[in-house]
């Protein structure tokens, strides 16, 4: 199993509950910005796809996941404002309404769960947050919301109360070194500099 360095326990807990159909429909993944929360979630979904498809057409599924085009996975993040050509300050209510439709649709792939990744839930404006709350109050079976948050204190308490909370701590030096070495950064001085 492809486990994210430093977060094996959290990964295994979520994955085992997912494959046993005992996972809460809403999962809040929190931790400092830049520690790999999105990477954690996408690797979790990757392992789920491998497990649930018994490796049938897995290259196709993984290619779709990598390109953000998988029909069972939606990523919600700040969009580009077409008028200004700049990234919007918030995730809007219209974006949340679109994922509501997605969450209610029947899966295009039989027996395969659907995933909605909100990166980052901290960027929901108040109308979007309230709309998301209504969706989370009536979860659809086999649809999972992963809310990524750098500052959970910014989220509505009522949203947080509906989520399984998983905190990913900042990596210790050993895990940090392992990540860099796995990415072919092996110079000790560089590793120490980047860690500090």
Question: What does each of the following model-derived ranges do?
Answer:
Residues 104, 130-147:
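Conserved catalytic/switch belt of AAA+ P-loop NTPases
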Residues 1-127:
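Clamp-loader machinery-focused feature within the broader ASCE/P-loop NTPase space
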Residues 162-196:
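Long, charge-dense, solvent-exposed interaction surfaces that engage phosphate-rich ligands
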């Amino acid at each position: 199993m492809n486990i994210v360095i430093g977060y094996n326990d959290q990964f295994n807990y979520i994955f085992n509950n997912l494959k046993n159909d005992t996972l809460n429909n809403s999962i809040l993944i929190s931790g400092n910005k830049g520690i790999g929360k999105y990477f954690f979630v996408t690797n979790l979904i990757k392992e789920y796809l491998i497990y649930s498809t018994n490796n049938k057409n897995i290259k196709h599924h993984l290619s779709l996941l990598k390109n953000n085009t998988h029909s069972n996975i939606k990523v919600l993040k700040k969009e580009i404002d077409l008028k200004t050509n700049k990234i919007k300050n918030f995730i809007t209510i219209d974006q949340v309404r679109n994922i509501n439709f997605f969450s209610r649709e029947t899966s295009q792939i039989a027996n395969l769960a659907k995933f909605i990744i909100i990166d980052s839930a901290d960027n929901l404006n108040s109308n979007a947050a309230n709309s998301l709350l209504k969706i989370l109050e009536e979860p659809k079976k086999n649809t999972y919301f992963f809310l990524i948050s750098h500052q959970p204190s910014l989220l509505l308490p009522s949203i947080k109360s509906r989520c399984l909370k998983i905190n990913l701590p900042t990596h210790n030096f050993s895990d940090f070194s392992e990540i860099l070495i796995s990415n072919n950064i092996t110079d000790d001085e560089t590793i120490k500099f980047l860690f500090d």
